[in-house]
Amino acid sequence: MNITSKKKYLAFDFGASNGRAIVGKYDGAKLELEEISRFDNKPVFVGGTLYWDVLRLFLELKVGIVKAKTKYKDISSLGLDTWGCDFGLLAKDKRLLSNPIQIELKTLLLL
């Protein structure tokens, strides 16, 4: 692969308090990383429980994709990383049943 044909990959990292979109450019020998967007990940507190604001995160995902595709027309793939200790429940038809619950302070204290 020559220097003019770098492959580009879009990655999203959704952390406990913020997230970001990063484009990785790889020429076969060297990987360069460029942050495309960064955003807050603030939970929604309802009835004593912290929930992920999945609609806001979905919006930020779309914003990051648009920004990356505007700058780089030839993105090869997309990857997404989130906290592994939180989860969402899906119905049989694959609809999200409710916003995923963030790990709670009382749960953390038990660990």
Q: Model regions: which residues?
A:
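Surface "functional belts" at beta-alpha junctions
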Residues: 101
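N-terminal glycine/serine-rich phosphate-binding loop of ATP-dependent small-molecule kinases
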Residues: 1-98
